[in-house]
Amino acid sequence: MHEGVQVSSKLEQLQALLAPVVVALGYECWGIEFSAQGRHSLLRVYIDKEGGVLVDDCAIVSRQISGVLDVEDPISVEYTLEVSSPGMERPLFTLEQFAKYVGEQVKIKLRSPFEGRRNFQGLLRGVEEQDVVVQVDDHEFLLPIDMIDKANIIPSFD
């Protein structure tokens, strides 16, 4: 089985397991990243709430998630758990999140090349069905959401 497929299904399993825990604590589960790197992996859970996230919020969620992970044991390798806010360079995971940030500058990395490239940096123009519309210079790209490996807002300090 392809490693990307394993990570993707693992990510879906973790999302189904952990998102309800985060929501039950009164936070939004902004997104989950799981990267298997050799013998050590990283599980990063992004939380958000109205008014922002404090360090104490991350600690509360981390304790609860750790308990669930200890009982359910969905990760068979050694890993580090990080709970954090999305921050200024907010990662984008869903079409709804992309739609919320139309008009912002974004950086997008694809899982595999699309129209000869994997990296796109430009203006987020919108969402059309299952595609994210990004304008790079004078060209618009319709990037399928399922091809996006990583996407982040580029903060502007105007």
Swiss-Prot record:
Gene3D superfamilies: Ribosome maturation factor RimP, C-terminal domain, RimP-like superfamily, N-terminal. SUPFAM superfamilies: YhbC-like, C-terminal domain, YhbC-like, N-terminal domain. One of its GO terms (cellular component) is cytosol. It is found in: Cytoplasm. Pfam families: DUF150_C, RimP_N. Required for maturation of 30S ribosomal subunits. This is Ribosome maturation factor RimP. It comes from Pseudomonas fluorescens (strain ATCC BAA-477 / NRRL B-23932 / Pf-5). The gene is rimP.
